[in-house]
Curated annotation (Swiss-Prot):
UniProt-annotated stretches for the region Important for cytoskeleton localization: 82-176
pLxIS motif, short sequence motif: residues: 483-486
Described purpose of this protein according to its UniProt entry: Plays a role in the inhibition of host innate immunity by inducing the degradation of key host factors required to activate interferon production such as IRF3, IRF5 or IRF7. Associates with components of cullin RING ligases (CRLs) including CUL1 or CUL3, which are essential multisubunit ubiquitination complexes, to modulate their activities.
Protein's name according to its UniProt entry: Non-structural protein 1
Residue segments, region Interaction with host IRF3: 319-493
Keywords: Host cytoplasm, Host cytoskeleton, Host-virus interaction, Inhibition of host innate immune response by virus, Inhibition of host IRF3 by virus, Inhibition of host IRF7 by virus, Inhibition of host RLR pathway by virus, Interferon antiviral system evasion, Metal-binding, RNA-binding, Viral immunoevasion
Main subcellular location: host cell
GO MF annotations, alphabetized: metal ion binding; RNA binding
Organism this protein belongs to: Rotavirus A (isolate RVA/Mouse/Brazil/EHP/1981/G16P[20]) (RV-A)
GO biological process: one example: symbiont-mediated suppression of host cytoplasmic pattern recognition receptor signaling pathway via inhibition of IRF7 activity
Annotated stretches, region: RNA-binding: 1-81
Domain notes: The integrity of the zinc-binding domain in NSP1 is important for degradation of host IRF3.
Length: 493
């Protein structure tokens, strides 16, 4: 097992380039790391072990040994993990560069085999060509990669991943890219490497190669908010939660993601110079993204009390102290605007409910409560239009000239009063609301705080390093969420 890790340990003594590139944390002394129950493959050393979160992207893809070097596949520094990473789309030229990189860093020829045999025989009590002592020589060249599916692209991290484990809780899936290359050509490359090995090691090499090169591909799954660690989140002030990440940057810049790999094959001195100028740079990013909004909203809706719609409370829904209406939820754990949306929507729906439905008090149960909870859960999705239609018909609308109306004569506070007047572009608050007016107000209460069309789906911790540097230089890295407020909020100021 862990042939890739053993190969990095033994091959790092071959050349100066290997000495710089093949130094991984799994072959160094262990340092304390945050524990985790997630079992998977470390993308840096390829061994199957317990994973912890990466300091560069907050994903669980690094083991407790390799995390000490703080390397991420999104770094700007051309370390081994970065060189093994290819950005979609996959082409034959990119795969050919991966094969050449393996041949450059992990060569197998007569001199290499002789060197390892000599270094092994100088120790006693070792049988000739035992797999445990020549594990580095049976590292096959395969095109199996761990695919991390972001919104706009897929990152393929190539390596030799051994063993079996459940991939459902991992941020990546394994894909076999051999069909995009040439299966027969890859077989020929590995057969040439096997020819230099002793007969006993050839059997091990052939078995590993055919097992690894014939595995089926899994469908890459898009990242979700649960894939990102919450341990990199910090509270910054009363209203913002930010994420601290670290990326390795250098003085050298490349135009495309694969340029460092091409320079490794054509200009090794540039790679060595870039490795000498690397530094770890912190980035304090905002945590506003669509997946986090859905995650926080689902937690809030789980504790929501729709019976507030039947109450006479003066306080907002999030601050009321009532056995039936109070929300047992810590609002400091979610974005402050979600709390405002929850209060505004519940306040508006209560006015509609008290104007049309004969309900007793907040302690009474109503079939409408399930409809309200379902609508709150879909506030940020396209399904909200359908749930708004169901909500409107819960208020017993009356049809006049093929237009449905509900009453709206229950008192509202000045904030909602002024907002409805500006939303409907009218001079006074109407006593009846049509279906179009009802949905316009309901959608505007959500869009008042978020311009969902401008919010990215995933956290900025998965963004490329060059984009983080650009945002940091413009001063929009930590304060970028201010730019995502809707235009209606700007007009209010």
């Amino acid at each position: 097992m862990a042939a890739f890790k053993d190969a990095c340990f033994h091959y790092r003594r071959i050349t100066k380039l290997n000495r710089e590139l093949l130094r991984i944390g799994a072959n160094s002394s262990w340092t304390p790391a945050p524990p985790s129950n997630i079992r998977g493959w470390c993308l840096e050393c390829c061994q199957l072990t317990n994973l912890t979160y990466c300091y560069g992207c907050s994903l669980h893809h690094v083991c407790q040994w390799c995390v000490q070097y703080g390397r991420c596949f999104l770094d700007d520094e051309p370390h081994l993990l970065r060189l093994r990473t290819v950005k979609s789309p996959i082409t034959t030229e990119k795969l050919a560069s991966i094969v050449k990189m393996y041949q450059l860093l992990f060569p197998i020829n007569h001199s290499i085999v002789k060197k390892f045999v000599k270094s092994t025989k100088q120790h006693k009590c070792r049988n000739d060509f035992e797999l445990s002592w020549y594990n580095q020589l049976v590292l096959p060249i395969t095109l199996t990669a761990a695919a991390v599916h972001c919104d706009d692209c897929i990152y393929y991290i190539f390596g030799h991943y051994e063993g079996k484990a459940n991939q459902s809780n991992l941020p990546y899936r394994f894909v076999n890219c051999v069909d995009e290359y040439d299966r027969l050509l890859l077989d020929d490359v590995n057969f040439d490497r096997m020819a230099f090995l002793p007969g006993r090691l050839q059997k091990y090499y052939a078995k590993r190669y055919f097992i690894a090169s014939r595995i089926p591909s899994a469908q890459p799954a898009k990242l979700t908010y649960s894939d990102f660690s919450v341990k990199t989140l910090i509270n910054s002030g009363a209203y913002a939660r930010r994420r601290i990440i670290y990326r390795s940057v250098t003085n050298f810049h490349w135009q495309s993601h694969e340029d460092p790999l091409n320079d490794l094959l054509l200009d090794k001195d540039k790679i060595l110079a870039a490795l000498m100028t690397n530094e770890r740079r912190p980035f304090l990013t905002h945590n506003l993204n669509f997946t986090s909004l859905l995650h926080e909203l689902s937690e809030l809706v789980h504790h929501a009390k729709p019976c507030y719609l039947h109450s006479f409370h003066v306080q907002p829904a999030s601050k009321v102290h009532c056995h039936s209406c109070s929300v047992a939820f810590d609002f400091h754990t979610v974005d402050w605007r979600i709390r405002r949306i929850y209060d505004d929507v519940m306040y508006f729906l209560r006015a509609c409910c008290r104007s049309n439905v004969s309900s007793g008090s907040c302690s009474s149960l109503d079939p409408m409560d399930a409809v309200v909870k379902a609508a709150l859960l879909e506030m940020f999705t396209e399904s909200f239009k359908h749930h708004a239609h169901l909500l409107f018909h819960c208020f017993d609308p009356v049809q006049i000239d093929d237009v449905s109306y509900i009453l709206f004569n229950y008192p509202v506070n000045y904030d909602i009063y002024d907002f409805i007047i500006r939303t409907l572009a009218t001079e006074r608050l109407p006593f009846t609301l049509s279906y179009k007016q009802f949905t316009t107000i309901l959608f505007a209460l959500v869009e008042r705080w978020y311009d969902l069309s401008q919010i990215e789906r995933l956290p900025l911790s998965i963004a490329p390093t060059n984009r983080l540097i650009e945002l940091q230089e413009r001063g929009n890295l930590a304060e970028e969420f201010d730019l995502l407020l809707s235009s209606s909020d700007s007009e209010e100021d």
